[in-house]
Design a protein with these regions (language model features):
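Cytochrome P450 heme-binding "Cys pocket" and the immediately downstream C-terminal segment
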Residues: 344, 469-476, 481, 487-523
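Cytochrome P450 heme-thiolate monooxygenase catalytic core
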Residues: 162-329
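N-terminal membrane-proximal hinge/A-helix region immediately C-terminal to the signal-anchor transmembrane segment
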Residues: 2-142
Length: 540
């Protein structure tokens, strides 16, 4: 895919940069030695003039290495910090990271005019060029409430009705995808797992956000999936070039990587039709109302300044990107963990069978506590993001310990490093499926799950029980007032994907030792080419 081509060439550039870096280090070391041994003098003026720029070049190359080594650089800096705030240099700015909840809460409490989530997101996604000229303000006021109310109240409340339809669609989708894989022996088929998961998340989200018609439109779904990839490519290129080139280059790239435009045009037609349907209902025509995010956003649109078609489409595209991107990579990592720990699979199958999908639907997807704990432990050890609570500094900001951050830089927390801290987590580097399960729930599960014993599967420490959607000890969903309001839907959708896969199919990795992830900046992505063996179960 085009992303692989881009990353391959970026890797070649990094190799060339590495060679330059070695030469730069050697020369800057010479400069350091001159200054240390002789100090500045007239005799050294020539060397200072020649070599001083190389010190700057060395720093820039080190910052560029963050592109492909971001998580490792953050981890190394975290281990040296002893709990204090620490900083890492990136090609565009400095990131100041914190790793304790006191300072994380200080980030959350800061005014949005000082530390801005939207300004950081705008820098990452370049929405003016990737999302059809969507202009974000650095500070969102009350006009952002329609989307928040839609996701937190309307979508979460509709889950008991929505989840059975999503599961039905996904069962059909997985069967179709299985048929397209190459058969290797006796009904066993082989293929790449990530495209399957990405397609499942896209279809699920399209149903919830846009309604069943667009969710079953292959052309729309293809554009929606490509839009994720194209957004990342365009935004990353624009972040790497001087701002004076961003407008012409952004137009050039978006005209060629045009899946965002295809998606925008389809959503514009759909939202426009919804407005016409509303007018017709006012005139007495019997046109049924839809139950999806388009309709609910229209319901909650500000009365004093109603959102029009363009604003609604832009909001839908933004939430589409975030939800598909994060959920697909998270679900894929969980599947990798199931393949690494096949002893967990039968336990989770029995939990799904004992609980039943009907009870799951009625709960809005908020039960299956064993699977919930498995998903949380998977995300703890294999997060797809190294940072959270990401904010761009708009005004000088100081933490309570005196650490100052200047405008243009970012402040973030470091959850990936924090989640492996042995001072916080017992057996921090080990995968324990029941780490987040309450003891009484595990004790009850032993009454209906065969092979489940406290000797074989233990809770490594008391007091860590919590659900996947909790925020008290967890940063996957963001922090405090800026946390993800769609997390109840996302959690339920991932449970359906995992539950359907393990109850209907046997799955294992073709090469369990092959590399599965690569990093770019702070993100960690699964390789799209990782192969699985997949076979339909007899009782499915």
């Amino acid at each position: 895919m085009f992303t692989a081509w881009v990353l391959n060439h970026l890797a070649q550039a990094a190799l060339l940069g590495g060679s330059c870096m070695l030469a730069t280090i050697a020369l800057s070391t010479l400069l350091d030695a001159v200054l240390k041994n002789n100090g500045p003098s007239k005799g050294n003026d020539f060397l200072l003039v020649i070599l001083s720029p190389l010190v700057y070049l060395k720093a820039r190359i080190k910052a560029l290495s963050f592109l492909v080594q971001g998580p490792a650089i953050i981890q190394a800096a975290y281990e040296k910090s002893n709990g204090a705030p620490f900083s890492v240099a990136t090609p565009s700015n400095t990131i100041v990271l914190v790793s304790d909840w006191k300072r994380i809460k200080e980030i959350d409490a800061a005014p949005e005019g000082t530390l801005s989530l939207l300004a950081a997101a705008k820098e990452v996604l370049q929405p003016k060029h990737t999302m059809s000229d969507f202009t974000w303000n650095d500070k969102r006021g009350s006009d952002g409430a329609p989307l928040q109310m839609t996701l937190r109240s309307r979508l979460a409340g509709y889950l008991p009705s929505l989840l059975p339809r999503i599961r039905q669609d996904l069962c059909a989708l997985f069967d179709q995808r299985l048929d397209t894989l190459a058969e290797v022996a006796n009904g066993v088929r082989q293929g790449a797992i990530f495209p399957i998961i990405l397609g499942a998340v896209a279809q699920s989200n399209a149903h919830a956000f846009f309604g069943p018609e667009l969710a079953r439109d292959p052309k729309f779904l293809t554009a929606g999936i490509k839009m994720i990839e194209h957004t990342l490519i365009i935004a990353e290129i624009l972040r790497m070039v001087p701002s004076v080139f961003s407008t012409p280059l952004g137009k050039f790239l978006s005209d060629r990587l045009d899946s965002g435009k295809v998606m925008t045009e389809a959503l514009t037609r759909e939202v426009s039709q919804r407005f016409r349907d509303r007018e017709l209902r006012k005139e007495g025509h019997e046109i049924p109302e839809q139950n999806d995010c388009i309709e609910w956003i229209m319901d909650h649109s500000p009365r004093h300044k109603p959102w029009g078609v363009t604003r609604i489409v832009h909001e839908l595209i933004a939430v589409w990107f975030g939800s598909v991107h994060i959920a697909s990579t998270t679900a894929c990592a969980a599947i990798f963990d199931l393949c690494d720990h096949p002893e967990f699979v039968d336990i989770l199958r029995q939990e799904v069978s004992h609980t039943g999908w009907e009870a799951f639907d009625k709960s809005g997807g908020q039960i299956l506590p064993l699977m919930d704990s498995f998903m949380k432990e998977s995300a703890r050890l294999n997060p797809i993001e190294s940072v959270s609570s990401r904010r761009k500094v708009l005004r000088p900001f100081g933490f309570s310990d005196g650490t100052m951050v200047q405008p243009g830089d970012w402040v973030c927390s470091a959850p990936r490093a924090m989640n492996r801290n042995p001072n916080t987590w017992s057996k921090a580097d080990e995968f324990h499926i029941f780490r987040f399960v309450k003891p009484e729930i595990l004790q009850h599960a032993q009454t209906y799950i065969e092979g489940l014993s406290s000797e074989k599967f233990m809770i490594p420490e008391a007091g860590k029980s919590s659900s996947y959607t909790d925020l008290t000890d967890w940063q996957q969903w963001g922090t405090g007032k800026a946390s993800c309001t769609g997390r109840w839907y996302a959690s339920a959708a991932i449970k359906i994907i995992l539950g359907v896969l393990i109850t209907r199919y046997d799955i294992k990795l073709v090469n369990p030792t092959a590399k599965r992830y690569f990093s770019w900046r702070t993100f960690i992505y699964p390789y799209q080419s990782t192969q699985i063996l997949m076979k339909q179960r007899n009782n499915s």
